């Protein structure tokens, strides 16, 4: 008999929830007050009362051969000999006492009452909802005595809708599993190493372990990871598969692999989650007073979900069309669908970022498999997720807007002033420097930042009197919330940085991505981190907190080495010599494209270096811009997809055109890489270098060389995409001949000079 666990709160909130989309308060003080209110009330209860009493009720769903185990903890329980009493404690912060209990709060108490009646055979039970202050003072108390039959009837009103959803999902699961059992690999033959990779992924899921895999570009990594994950899904080894990417452009490989698998009559709900602002059709404030889709969204989404469950194709177009049909917010609709989807393709953030990860999935269950594409990005991305800042200059600008719109007595204005004053009062070094590190922050600094975050959240809940400031509130709020979260973690994992002497920016900079990634993925149903540049594997596993029993797998290149001609030319591209190097670089590029006309991409360490060289390059070319939307990027690449013609493009190494794009055949004849890709020397990289020097013994390797050579390998990997592709890569830097850099190159590279 299969067992499914659900909490009392989850069951109740499935049916009893708000109608509108509203920002969850998220106030730090509210969360603290709620806990304190519970504890204070529990201490004030008399003799015989017990706090946080666990209670479970198994519910047999015979036709599904399923046992639904309902569980939770009663806030307070009096085990009286005649009629026991259940108390549900909630925080109340309203100006006036509540006139009646909130339906969802009352239903939670009723559910516990029903569970007691069933498990103890009681004829009746007392239930009450009590609203208290943070000190436990009662603001409202609503007692009831209910018979067992009354409890059962009310309980059924929330259980039956939930069971309807469960039955529908299980019907789909049976059809899905049958189709997955018959699923075959989407190509007639495996490429060399591809089958071994698939076995490794399947084993990682079965063992609930992590796998770190280096897979050369063009080896069919999407199929080699998705196929075994889907097989494991069909066998019940995992509940969902999340395919995570670092960039939107990298999703296409997964989508193409799924499309090919769907040709086998596959019953699979595969969902793509785009950024909220990208999906928004109205581009108004996400508030029921401003957006008709936000108003009443949750009254309409149940019907939309049920209709969506009747179709297999959950493409972005179909999800958007269903959201339009029911006047729903597309993003929130996708968030609801992700709870029952089989496969979800999304950005790293939705699984790993503590600020925006899908709590309804990753806080509620560990029965999820992660397939993490281009995983060499993870250390930097996780550092970004865990870091946060307080920008004094930005706060001053926003405070001016808030002051004009709402007045200087507004709580938000006052809270901003407190933080600005706290930043101004920091004791910075008197050596005239414009940036540096601080050993610690004053004791009251965190307090005023927490208060400002709460004031921000309150303002965002208001009917905004200042629409101009509305958007800026979010831009300032997110780094501040991240800063507050960072300050609650172990200070040993952070460095405190300051930038700008007049109006400083204070950053809590995360140093350790390994510990967080290890914790975030612990106990999941398999995690596969894969990339063409997850190399060297021992070092990358170390950076990502892998355990000794987490497997490493290096997939050999399936393509003949002679198909890629790699040539190195000694050019000094170091920062101090770049101006003089531009002429030689332009000469090398001209010689390459003149001797063998075709389609080429040239990658530079920076936009400044790119522009300097472009001025000396007497050839027609297209140049990557700093800001390019999807349409501009598509137009940029379209030149390569034309059947004929020569194309030369100048791009930035590590940008959108050096990773995640697929130009097979004669769409790309070669690449030129200028420099070895080292990150720019700045405060952040130097702090990282010092950290890795202390912890891993080689700061320059981990802070500079590894990320640099990963970008180089990705760029060169654009050339060979299929078994028949041939091409050239020109590496312009004398350091490519150094043993320390050669060790970081893929084993199949054969370099001539």
Segments (PLM) and residue ranges:
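Conserved pre-motif I regulatory segment
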Residues: 171-214
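A substrate-engagement module of RecA-like helicase motors
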Residues: 178, 184, 237-344, 352, ...
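Walker A/P-loop
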Residues: 206-228
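Mg2+/Mn2+-dependent nuclease catalytic core
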Residues: 57-153
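A contiguous, basic/glycine-rich beta-loop/short-helix subdomain that forms a polymer-engagement track
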Residues: 319-339, 344, 355-361, 455-565, ...
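Conserved RecA-like P-loop NTPase helicase motor core
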Residues: 570-580, 626-737
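Metal-dependent nuclease catalytic cores that hydrolyze phosphodiester bonds in DNA/RNA
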Residues: 1-82, 107
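Signature of the SF2 helicase/ATPase Hel1-core->accessory helical subdomain module
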Residues: 252, 326-343, 347-451, 532-546, ...
């Amino acid at each position: 008999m299969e067992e499914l666990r659900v909490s009392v709160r989850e069951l109740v909130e499935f049916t009893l929830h708000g109608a509108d989309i509203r920002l969850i308060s998220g106030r730090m003080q509210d969360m603290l007050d709620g806990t304190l209110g519970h504890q204070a009330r529990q201490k004030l209860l008399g003799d015989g009362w017990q706090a946080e009493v666990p209670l479970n009720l198994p519910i047999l769903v015979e036709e599904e051969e399923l046992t639904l185990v309902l569980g939770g903890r009663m806030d307070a329980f009096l085990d009286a000999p005649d009629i026991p009493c259940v108390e549900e404690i909630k925080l109340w912060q309203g100006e006036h006492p509540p006139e009646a209990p909130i339906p969802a709060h009352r239903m939670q108490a009723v559910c516990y009452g029903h569970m007691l009646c069933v498990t103890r055979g009681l004829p009746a039970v007392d239930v009450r909802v009590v609203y208290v202050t943070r000190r436990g003072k009662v603001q409202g108390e609503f007692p009831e005595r209910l018979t067992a039959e009354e409890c059962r009837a009310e309980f059924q009103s929330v259980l039956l809708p939930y069971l309807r959803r469960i039955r529908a999902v299980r019907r789909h699961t049976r059809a899905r599993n049958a189709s997955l059992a018959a699923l075959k690999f989407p190509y007639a033959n495996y490429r060399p190493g591809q089958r071994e990779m698939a076995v490794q992924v399947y084993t990682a899921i079965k063992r609930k372990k992590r796998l770190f895999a280096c897979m050369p570009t063009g080896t069919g990594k999407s199929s080699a990871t998705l196929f075994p994950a889907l097989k494991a899904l069909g066998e019940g080894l995992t509940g969902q598969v999340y395919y995570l990417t670092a960039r939107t452009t990298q999703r296409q490989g997964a989508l193409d692999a799924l499309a090919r698998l769907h040709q086998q009559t596959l019953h699979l709900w595969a969902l793509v989650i785009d950024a909220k602002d990208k999906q928004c059709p109205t581009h108004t404030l996400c508030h029921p007073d401003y957006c008709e889709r936000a108003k009443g969204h949750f009254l309409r989404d149940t019907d939309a979900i049920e209709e969506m469950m009747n179709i297999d194709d959950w493409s972005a177009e179909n999800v958007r069309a269903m959201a339009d049909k029911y006047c729903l917010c597309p993003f929130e609709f996708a968030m609801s669908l992700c709870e029952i989807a089989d496969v979800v393709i999304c950005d790293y953030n939705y699984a790993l970022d503590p600020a925006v990860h899908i709590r309804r999935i990753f806080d509620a269950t560990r029965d999820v498999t992660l397939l993490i594409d281009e995983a060499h990005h993870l250390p930097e991305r996780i550092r970004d997720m865990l870091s946060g800042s307080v920008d004094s200059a930005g706060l001053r600008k926003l405070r001016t807007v808030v002051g004009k719109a709402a007045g200087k007595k507004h709580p938000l204005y006052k809270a901003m002033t407190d933080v600005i004053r706290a930043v101004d009062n920091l004791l910075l070094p008197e050596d005239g420097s414009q940036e540096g590190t601080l050993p610690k922050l004053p004791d009251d600094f965190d307090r005023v930042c927490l208060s400002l975050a709460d004031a921000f959240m309150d303002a965002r809940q208001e009917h905004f009197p200042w629409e101009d400031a509305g958007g800026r509130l979010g831009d300032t709020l997110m780094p501040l919330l991240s800063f507050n979260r960072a300050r609650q973690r172990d200070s040993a994992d952070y460095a405190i940085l300051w930038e700008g002497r007049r109006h400083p920016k204070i950053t809590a900079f995360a140093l350790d991505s390994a510990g967080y990634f290890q914790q975030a993925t612990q106990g999941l149903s398999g995690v596969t981190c894969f990339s063409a540049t997850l190399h060297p594997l021992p070092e990358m596993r170390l950076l990502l907190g892998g355990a000794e029993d987490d497997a490493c797998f290096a997939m050999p290149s399936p393509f003949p080495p002679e198909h890629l001609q790699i040539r190195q030319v000694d050019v000094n591209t170091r920062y101090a010599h770049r101006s003089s190097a531009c002429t030689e670089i332009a000469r090398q590029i001209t010689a390459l494209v003149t001797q063998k006309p075709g389609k080429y991409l040239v990658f530079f360490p920076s936009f400044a270096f790119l522009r300097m060289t472009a001025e000396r390059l007497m050839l027609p070319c297209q140049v990557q811009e700093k800001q390019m939307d999807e349409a501009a990027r598509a137009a940029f690449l379209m030149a390569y997809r034309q059947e004929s013609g020569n194309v030369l493009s100048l791009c930035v190494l590590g940008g959108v055109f050096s990773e995640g794009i697929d130009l097979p055949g004669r769409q790309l004849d070669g690449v030129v890489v200028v420099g070895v890709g080292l990150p720019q020397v700045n405060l952040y990289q130097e702090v990282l270098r010092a950290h890795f020097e202390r912890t891993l013994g080689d700061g320059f390797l981990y802070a500079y060389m590894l990320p640099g050579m990963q970008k180089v390998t990705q760029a060169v990997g654009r050339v060979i995409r299929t078994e028949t592709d041939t091409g050239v890569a020109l590496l312009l830097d004398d350091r490519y001949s150094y043993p320390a850099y050669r060790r970081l190159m893929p084993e199949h590279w054969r370099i001539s000079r």
